């Protein structure tokens, strides 16, 4: 058997764009034959997948799955919205959500987990090779309670449990599971619409709160208000801010005459026990990803060899 050197792995990686470990495996499987190793990578779709991995993937689907006291939400990105309507891609997202439910929300653990004899990472690469677009498991999150429910809501669903936005909400309660699930779904819909930053003021980033205080204070200093008056105005302004960005203090979208906290308290009678919102996660597709702008005319010119 030929000795596989670092230089050989480097050369194969440069010629195919495949990962280092994949290149080493390809050379080992093919007794150091470079051309055979390249073909091996192509057959497995790894060379093609790696070449596409540099392209921006900002579309795709959010997958959400909840069962009883546990729930997960995942984001799987593709390059175009068209792929989100592809049955293979949709199945991949649902499979990833199930694996995340089983092994936890660590992205690397999810990618290493196997479904049958195939890892999730391999399944993603196979889909890239088949569909022809870059894809990536971007992030995952999970919530769990000791008693109660975790509910979910998917906005813009293209299939059950997958769409353009996904929310999971955890409710701790000894109450009736069916009533809790219904309440949890209502709150998840609220989170999707209202986009709270935290459950309550204590969960806000101190830097965000400081920035808000500074903006308010500077505004009234420019108006010539004395410092003792500014302090009171800022405190009042912060209370208004909390009502805008903290879930428990927001006006409930299903009944704007009460806050989310009040709505939850009023639901306790129907639920049959005290209810506490233990947490929530809201994923909107592509948030924070800078999408690539394309010049269609330039692409056509490039394809035809013109400048």
Curated annotation (Swiss-Prot):
Gene Ontology terms for molecular function: translation elongation factor activity
Gene3D superfamilies: 1.10.286.20, DNA helicase RuvA subunit, C-terminal domain (1.10.8.10), Elongation factor Ts, dimerisation domain (3.30.479.20)
Region (Involved in Mg(2+) ion dislocation from EF-Tu): 80-83
Keywords: Cytoplasm, Elongation factor, Protein biosynthesis
InterPro entries: EF-Ts_dimer_sf, Transl_elong_EFTs/EF1B, Transl_elong_EFTs/EF1B_dimer, Transl_elong_Ts_CS, UBA-like_sf
Pfam families the UniProt entry points to: EF_TS
GO cellular component: cytoplasm
Subcellular location: Cytoplasm
CDD domains in the cross-refs: UBA_EF-Ts
Main location: cytoplasm
GO biological process, one term: translational elongation
NCBIfam families given in the database record: tsf
Function: Associates with the EF-Tu.GDP complex and induces the exchange of GDP to GTP. It remains bound to the aminoacyl-tRNA.EF-Tu.GTP complex up to the GTP hydrolysis stage on the ribosome.
Family as reported in the entry's similarity comment: Belongs to the EF-Ts family.
Name of the protein described by the UniProt record: Elongation factor Ts
Species of the source: Bradyrhizobium diazoefficiens (strain JCM 10833 / BCRC 13528 / IAM 13628 / NBRC 14792 / USDA 110)
Lineage: Bacteria, Pseudomonadati, Pseudomonadota, Alphaproteobacteria, Hyphomicrobiales
């Amino acid at each position: 058997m030929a000795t596989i050197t670092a230089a050989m792995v480097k050369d194969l990686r440069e010629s195919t764009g495949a990962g280092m470990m994949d290149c080493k495996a390809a050379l080992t499987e093919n007794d150091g034959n470079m051309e055979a190793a390249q073909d091996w990578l192509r057959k497995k779709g790894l060379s093609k997948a790696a070449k596409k991995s540099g392209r921006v993937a900002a579309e795709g689907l959010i997958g959400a799955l909840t069962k009883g006291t546990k729930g997960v939400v995942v984001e799987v990105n593709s390059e175009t919205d068209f792929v989100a309507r592809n049955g293979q891609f949709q199945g991949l997202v649902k499979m990833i959500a199930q694996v995340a439910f089983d092994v936890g929300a660590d992205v690397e653990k999810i990618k290493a987990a196997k479904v049958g004899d195939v890892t999730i990472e391999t399944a993603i690469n196979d889909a890239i090779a088949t569909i022809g677009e870059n894809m990536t498991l971007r992030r995952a999150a999970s919530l769990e309670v000791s008693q109660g429910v975790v509910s979910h809501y998917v906005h813009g669903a293209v299939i059950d449990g997958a769409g353009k936005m996904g929310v999971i909400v955890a409710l701790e309660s000894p109450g009736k599971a069916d009533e809790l699930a219904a309440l949890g779904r209502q709150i998840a819909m609220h989170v999707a619409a209202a986009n709270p930053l935290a459950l309550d003021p204590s969960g806000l980033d101190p830097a965000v709160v400081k920035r808000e205080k500074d903006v308010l204070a500077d505004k009234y200093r420019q108006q010539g208000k004395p410092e003792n008056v500014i302090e009171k105005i800022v405190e009042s302004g912060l209370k208004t801010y909390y009502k805008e960005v903290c879930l428990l203090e927001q006006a409930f979208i299903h009944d704007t005459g009460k806050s989310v906290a009040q709505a939850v308290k009023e639901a306790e009678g129907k639920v049959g026990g005290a209810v506490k919102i233990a947490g929530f996660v809201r994923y909107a597709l592509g948030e924070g990803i800078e999408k690539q702008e394309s010049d269609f005319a330039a692409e056509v010119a490039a394809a035809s060899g013109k400048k």
